Amino acid sequence: MLNQFSRTELLFGKEAMEKLANSRVAVFGIGGVGGYTVEALVRSGIGKLDLIDDDKVCLTNLNRQIIATRSTVGKYKVDVMKDRILDINPKAEVNVHKCFYLPETRDEFDFSQYDYVVDAVDTVTAKIQLVMEAKEAGVPIISSMGAGNKLDPTAFQVADIYKTSVCPLAKVMRRELKKRGIKKLKVVYSQETPTRPIEDMAISCRTNCICPPGAAHKCTERRDIPGSTAFVPSVVGLIIAGEVIKDLAGKK
């Protein structure tokens, strides 16, 4: 019967679509990368999603985040994303977690219940812990490397973490994961040399923070504020979603 996933089924087949509908994917970080990942996952037929993020939509998110509009500023990102998911597929099961994933909060999550984990967070400590937990649970995970300060969406590619180069975040991850005995990790990274942001205090979030009241992470507390565009993190998110869908559907 013709349905909203019929065009996708033409490529994957009925059996694969049923598998996607029964798959549960956890996406950590619902920002510029994670938001587009979730968008593509639900539109591709993933039936169960866990959204993890404690941040609220900020005016400065409008330049790149799919959930950011004037009407959503000040709302929790996971709540906005959940509403969007259910508007696309009312049958989807969505669990929201308003928390920032760190080693201290890991006990709140049972990774064994996930079929796939997406790491779309920025903090190295959180990324490492996510990888460790997923590997221990035997759950596939894909991790986003640096998407900030980049201008070339065509420079991103999928690779094992130990085959990456150029990306500063990937370099740190290689070192830290090697220390912990992690042998491999699928990542999306860029071979583009990062662009140095213009130092202009008038447009710096560090000196002119406009985060909504109650926002979890004040820009004034951040060491660096990376530059961003609409056409880079979105591409990273879509690449990640493609890898998740193809892996779960057995299309490799």
What do the predicted segments below correspond to?
Residues 2, 109-116, 126, 136, ...:
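Glycine-rich phosphate/adenylate-binding loop
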